[in-house]
Amino acid sequence: VIGKAEAAPLLLDGLRRLEYRGYDSAGIATLVNGRIERRRAEGKLVNLAAALAARPLPGVTGIGHTRWATHGAPTISNAHPHGTARVAVVHNGIIENHAELRAELEAAGQVFSTETDTETVAQLVDHLLKQGASPEEAAPAAFARLEGAYALALLFAGHSELLIGAQRGAPLAVGYGDAEMYLGSDALAMAPLTQQIAYLEDGDWVVVRRETASFFAAGAAVSRAKKVTSLTGAAIGKGNFRHFMEKEMHEQPVVIGDLLHRMVDAASQMPVLPALPFDLAKISHMTLSACGSGYYAALTGKFWLESISRVPVEADVASEFRYRAPPMRENGLGVLLSQSGETADTLAALRYMAAQGQNILSVVNVPESSIARASEAILDTIAGPEISVASTKAFTAQLTVLAVFALAVARARGALPDTEIARLTDALLELPAKAAEVLANDGTIHALAARIAEARDVLYLGRGACYPIALEGALKLKEISYIHAEGYAAGELKHGPIALIDKAVPVIAICPSGPLFEKTASNLQEAAARGGQIVVFSDPVGAAKLRAIAAATIVLPKIDPFAAPILYAIPVQMLAYHVAVLKGTDVDQPRNLAKSVTVE
């Protein structure tokens, strides 16, 4: 911030708006009478606020950061900002050649005080400043030496109206105020201060002064257009809910309904997509890629697209995809899924696909994000800000978008008659009401949670399009309750996982009635015969058939198998939530996790 009022309160508020991303320490630095002063704290922002209350930081120019540890433990000494008497730095990303640079700088007399890769940036700039370079000369010279991904903001002693930022592989934006200027990794942090945003492109650096921002790339001045952000500065609260996760689960009927209202023509019951710069009928194949829950949504989308649209589809974990260097056929479509639109591995997969000549479509919840801006077209999940680290409404929104997209592809390719597309669309249109019905069944799931909370290991099983929901259920349980859980395709049970089953291991089956039900029921019989505690998530027909072997049954509304993965995602979220609450974990910000993973 280069402000008119004290910077520290603005920085602290901005960090609060980024709190959802996950972090383990935080800090702020400002210029006080031309000197750099810092306040840092381990743990939550409340600790930093207490440090600022005890020792206030004046000054109208400053930088702030919430850190998710990569190099060095989450301690006060390793918290950002890092720096020297001449320069302070905050950094998202990883400096891959920090060890070589550190050795070189120590040999030149620079004295390091932390274990972090970020301090290398500060020491490199400091070394150049000591040799007589100006900040505007030292910063780009340092950036040219860095390898890896980064978004950087630098504060210089004696320069009260100067910030320098740089971006490579991690997001950074400039905000324009009234005789104030801002730098931020997320437009949401700047939303209360400005609606005028300019995004740095990969490899850019920027000199920010009180009323101007000068952008540079490859040593030359460039222009970067201001855009009006659609993000609001309104505070995001939990309302009457205990946690953001609980609130966001209960928002799912409305989110799904809003998406269907946007993506389905009310008169014809046909899917409607925004204008696309490529012809879906001529796409030769698709490659879906994402991380975490988004990858499980991609797996579900693969099932839908192949089975009803008859198009070859691959679904890949983004962090593995580009390192395989897969050959990609002409006229292919890459579909990238990311809630934040900033996931580093997914962005890298996008760039690989684009370099291979693929058309690029992204499914994102932030239409101004890096992934969205790098795409030819986007499908916006319009779920609104998701604050809890564990994805709920963004996940079911991704599924809903992919389901409608699959129907649109099927229609474009003539893979299904309109009558069948209308029938499947009708099944999707039942989701908002049936999702609300599932959420109203909270007491039954809470009772089940008391049993699951005692387990050390849990298995989730699913088949077909519900196999990824088993994976998602296991992920949800492990990430917020810290119980070891694994998801498997039900048919794979006898190929290894059955060795784990005994009376202490709950086996949770995502098992709606339909064409695949009997096969999954046979797998559950195998588990029950070995003492497994069978927990069935099914509709009234399926639940009745499995009641004899089930230790517990969660009965869901009957729904067409096409729409079942979206509906069945909700009770597995609810179960994980209640188990986590019973175990007393930090539901919204579980240990070691970050919401937006901007490092590879």
Where on the chain are the PLM-derived regions?
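Glycine-rich phosphate-binding loops that contact phosphosugars or nucleotide phosphates
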Residues: 281-430, 510-554, 575
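Glycine-rich oxoanion-binding loops at beta->alpha junctions
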Residues: 60-77, 262-278, 301-337, 343, ...
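Active-site phosphate/pyrophosphate-binding segments
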Residues: 252-256, 260-287, 356, 377-506, ...
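Conserved short alpha-helical segments that host acidic/polar catalytic motifs at enzyme active sites
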Residues: 1-238, 242-243, 251-285, 418, ...
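Generic C-terminus detector
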Residues: 533, 546, 559-600
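Glycine-rich, anion-gripping cofactor-binding loops and their flanking helix/strand elements
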Residues: 173-195, 319-353, 492-526, 559-573, ...
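Acidic/histidine-rich
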Residues: 146-180, 448, 453-479, 521
